[in-house]
Amino acid sequence: MNHIQNAMNQAAELIRKAYDTAVAEGLLPEAEVRPVQIEIPKDLRNGDYASGFAMQNAKVLRQNPRKVAEILVEKMDLTGTCFASAEIAGPGFLNLRLSHSWFENVLTNITEEGENYGRTAAEKPEKIMVEFVSANPTGPMHMGNARGGVLGDCLAEVLHRAGNEVTREFYVNDAGNQIDKFASSLDARYRQIILGEDAVEFPENGYHGNDIKVLAQKFFEKNGDSYLNRPEKERHEALAAFGLENNIPAMKADLQRYLINYDVWFFESELHNSDYVADTVKKLTENGHTYEKDGALWLNTSYLLEQMYRAEGKSSEDIEKLELKDDVLRRANGFYTYFAADIAYHRNKFEVRGFDRVINIWCADHHGHVARLKCALDALGLDGTNRLEIVLMQLVQLVRAGQPVRMSKRTGNAIALHDLLDEVSVDAARFFFNSRHSASPIEFDLGLAVRNDSENPVYYVQYAHARNKSILKALAQDNIPTDVKTADLSLLVESAELDLIRDLSRLPEEIRLAAVQRDPSRLNRYATQVATAFHKFYTECRIKDAAPALREARILLSCCTAAVIENALSCFGVSAPDHM
């Protein structure tokens, strides 16, 4: 149950009904008033919920705003609602205070729903695909993949808990230029093993990582020099296939270690082998959006983008400054470009597999590709403008002792995901990478991530849970029942208790907002706030030494807190240990 939304809806309905009653009784004139807006005040001493309705509509009601507020408060009927009182503040703010029964209902609801607390039913559930990481299978995954993995996985989880049908997908780029470059790099290293490094020139734009040397050595150990004198095309195909056979399982293993499990691994080669790329380009041509030039087939991207920008209200002058260009779909040599395959892939998502919405997690340096892909899908009649969302993600900077870290101590290469997980826990990695909005860069402090104190944010939250569990365990060892399902919750009146319950009530709304805003980092901040509220409760409210009825109520509150922290952490794949 979403307690925040329910309370806000009740507050809005109370004010609207009070206005209608005042109009019916001739106390206020009938007018086109603005909709009732409800907010949560920063200072809860002013009330739990507030509205500026009286001030916003004073002009059309031809009354002093405070007078309008007085009339509305007088006509409010709080019977059967979650509110105990309505008050006026300042020039005409309407402040509503929650009744104690609301706080009691929150704890009852958490107790009843348990691990399902926080999940809600979407008003309009969608079939959504979240595609993320999709790293080239030509080498180890880097820090951008590490951040994108957590971002995509957590976003998929909150979308699911908010009531949508969600599919996690990894797109394997096993065709095209990068695979050609992968094959030529492996080929050079393979021949260097046999003929010597000086005898074989390494391609200037090849992959220079040590992993290429390792793969080439494995290929040599398996095949010897049997491929040395075979045709280059045959050798490249064998090397690329061998490399992918080794790299893709390694990528899957790293991601599973990182607690990321995909529903679908989709291979680019399937689009080419089934002629789906060719068919997609054919449809674009039939729709009048391509032309031939210099032996290549082009998409009239500049025209499509211009139409899209005009629809958004951009002026001709602004559009001209963008220097829009067209894109090649099929090269003069007959091969299709990556862009053509990408259009076909997204057409498959919508047209073949029937997703209502597709969300891609991309690094911010791909921003120039967003509008081009959307307008290409529009040209296919798939409404890419509205149905395709791209979440752009900023870079990650690893630091240790305040200094940037770029190389692995073990391998001497750029730090890969598996290197990171050798140094810090999966919990720490997932927490840190989900700690900020995707549009903000992340500074990942390796030293901080391994500290076992409250300075480490993941430790701080997990310790609150472990501390809570240890309290309950100690009580049970003293023969005090801790499996409490009901208690006299009216006894919970201390500010630390009520503040904690307020925070516990927010989980369903935080999950909803994380889904709507495409920002799962909200859950990190929320879990930290609950941990802080629990530490305050533990400091100010004794449990063991309290009177039996109050002790029972506080035990139930502690159990609810444990459930909420565990549920919140599970949204972004972090464990909630019972002891630390």
Label each region the model flagged.
Residues 105-110:
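Short, charged, solvent-exposed linker or helix-capping segments at domain edges/interfaces
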